[in-house]
Amino acid sequence: MLKGTMIKRNKMQLISTHPIKKSDLGFHANLFGGKLLAWLDASAAAFAMEVCDTPRMVTVKIDECIFKKSAKEGQMIKIYGKVESIGTTSLTLYMEARSHNVYSGRQSIILSTNITFVRID
């Protein structure tokens, strides 16, 4: 098993928050999907490093990504994650990106996926 801290496996944890700015928008004034995927991968990598107590973790696989809803300028994106499984050489995280309306406090899942990391020597 990978060396790591004792993180609750079934509890989603807030990892990062990103305000949506004009420069983050695509052609239809929605959050650009590539920007969201970059935030998701970077957040998951930081979480994997924390779980495994090492900065030597790299993304090896991102499962299917289905964009369920759009997000607009002025909303916040909150990225949550939890440990899905820990193997002898890999770690899989379940990740969610949620749009957060700062006025109402409502959140909607806009993307969820599993991301697998391995430790490099």
Q: What are the functions of these language-model segments?
A:
Residues L2-K61, V118-D121:
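Hot-dog-fold acyl-thioester-processing enzymes
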Residues G4, N10-L14, K72-E73, E84-D121:
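HotDog/MaoC-like acyl-thioester-processing domains
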Residues K22-D24, I62-K69, S99-N101:
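Short, well-ordered turn and helix-capping elements at secondary-structure junctions
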Residues T54-S70, Q75:
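Small beta-barrel nucleic-acid-binding modules, principally OB-folds
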